[in-house]
Amino acid sequence: MKIYSSIKKRCEHCRIVKRKGKRYVICKVNPSHKQRQG
């Protein structure tokens, strides 16, 4: 998982989710697209 100050969807399968005050990008098709903000 990469940590960025600004996160973007990298493909059409990526979803942005908020958990415990942090924003995540989750991608089931391409797990290498996982990101966290902050």
UniProtKB/Swiss-Prot annotation:
Name of the coding gene: rpmJ
Disulfide bonds: none
Source organism superkingdom: Bacteria
Protein's organism: Pelodictyon phaeoclathratiforme (strain DSM 5477 / BU-1)
Record's GO cellular component terms: ribonucleoprotein complex; ribosome
Gene Ontology molecular function, alphabetical: structural constituent of ribosome
Family that this chain belongs to: Belongs to the bacterial ribosomal protein bL36 family.
Name of the protein described by the UniProt record: Large ribosomal subunit protein bL36
InterPro entries named among the record's database cross-references: Ribosomal_bL36, Ribosomal_bL36_sp, Ribosomal_LSU_bL36
Keywords carried by this UniProt record: Ribonucleoprotein, Ribosomal protein
Pfam families according to UniProt: Ribosomal_L36
GO biological process, one term: translation
